[in-house]
Design a protein with these regions (language model features):
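Loop-to-transmembrane helix entry
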Residues: 3-19
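Loop-to-transmembrane helix entry/capping segments in MFS-fold secondary transporters
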Residues: 6, 93-103
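Transmembrane alpha-helical cores of Major Facilitator Superfamily
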Residues: 14-18, 47, 70, 101-109, ...
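Helix-to-loop junctions at the C-terminal end of transmembrane segments
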Residues: 23-37, 122
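Structural signature of the two symmetry-related core transmembrane helices
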Residues: 40-55, 135
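Helix-loop junctions at membrane interfaces in 12-TM secondary transporters
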Residues: 55-69
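Intracellular juxtamembrane helix-capping segments at the cytosolic ends
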Residues: 78-91
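A membrane-interface helix-boundary motif in multi-pass transporters
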Residues: 120-138
């Protein structure tokens, strides 16, 4: 057990929040290279998520958790802006709100059950097994992303 204090845990999320605000310019050149291809953007982000969980699975001290959070945050900056955009592109006319609601509901379910299921894995096995489990889920997400057929139509206009 690494015995991370509540204060240290809070620092991890503070790093995450600050990075989301200030590190956007660091990923802008990569987003430019991806030329607005949301599928590629999500692919890059998921690979970065996997890297963060791999690094963190070997954590023996708080510093490695900080490194893992920094890597994870870069993954977030690629994936999470793309998800509602794709939902909007996939939604039939008049159903955009319903699709956005589904995206938000899925995120909420993840926040509700993720810590519980992660805790079960840690209690039953160990931290490394939990991170391996998360990487397996991300491989599944990559497979789904690879078979996902992009909507090649023009983006929908949102009426004011």
């Amino acid at each position: 057990s690494i015995n991370i204090s509540m204060a240290q845990y809070s620092v991890l999320w503070t790093i995450n929040g600050i990075m989301i605000l200030v590190a956007q310019p660091l990923i802008k050149p990569i987003l430019y290279l991806l030329k607005g291809n949301l599928k590629k953007q999500m692919f890059v982000g998921i690979i970065i998520f996997m890297l963060s969980f791999f690094v963190t699975s070997f954590a023996e001290n708080f510093t490695i958790f900080v490194v893992g959070m920094i890597i994870l945050t870069f993954g977030e900056m690629f994936v999470w802006p793309a998800v509602p955009t794709i939902a909007n592109q996939l939604a039939p006319d008049g159903k955009q709100g319903q699709y956005q609601g589904f995206v938000n509901s899925a995120a909420t379910v993840g926040k509700a059950f993720g810590p519980f299921l992660g805790g079960v894995l840690v209690d039953a096995f160990n931290m490394r097994m939990m991170f391996i489990g998360m990487m397996v889920l991300l491989v599944f997400a990559l497979i789904l992303l690879m078979v996902f057929k992009e909507n090649n139509t023009q983006p929908k206009k949102i009426d004011a």
